[in-house]
Amino acid sequence: MKYNHLIAVLAVLSLVLMGCNNQKRLTKTEGNEPKKEVVKQKTIQQRAIEAQPDFQSVNAQKARFQLSYQRKSVAANGTIAMIKDSICIISLQPVLGIELFRLELTPADVLIVDKMNRRYVQMSYAEISEAVKMPITFADAQNVLMARMVVLGQSQSVLYSPAATASAADNNSTTVSITEGKINYQYRIDNSSLALLQADYTANGRGGKATVTYSGHNLFGNVLFPTAVNVTYLDSKYDVSCSISLPNLVFNGSVNAARINVRTYKKTTISTILN
């Protein structure tokens, strides 16, 4: 697969990625007995949300990407730099550490830069949502990258509702399922560490399906985080996957997250890059 296919993979991946207090009640008592406070047992999704990774920044300098698009694949080194609620930069450096492709996610938009061909695509989240038929926001993409449970376009508190059901996936994990809007969600949670192991997002009707798996969890300081992430997206038009190896992660340190200047690049469209 030629390196100019990398930008097509990166473009489709941008479409994919864009996409608790204790509850207490009082029991009635008879006579003069004092009222007892009963704490409602937390669901596994509540406990998982409380234990989910939380950090202000992350730097992955030795990331390894295995990319596949329309049955063609390529491997590339790269980096990931993120400042929470501000920006995430994914850089691909397939040749001698030279950056050829870049994906920038900010609350305002998504920027895909093909440095090899000196062109770029700038997309709003509304455009991305229309492309994948799923409501995507920056917060959703950020939560996916932070290995958190995501209900597209909504708060995680939706997972506290009775509509979210839990069942044993195997002896070591539990599956939490919920349907919101036109999307079916399934999350597999480790029973011991409460880490998110897999998330499936399936659009009803003719929509696509995205799956994100997280594995190789290690403790980096006080942050439990996966060292391997695999993202797949499949629909009638796209078949794309990306495996990311993250052997060296630094949390809550300084991050170089300066945006690229695209004034000397040619603006193009996502369809041009994908064709």
Regions found by a protein language model. Give the residues of each.
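Bacterial N-terminal signal peptides that target proteins for export
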Residues: 1-9
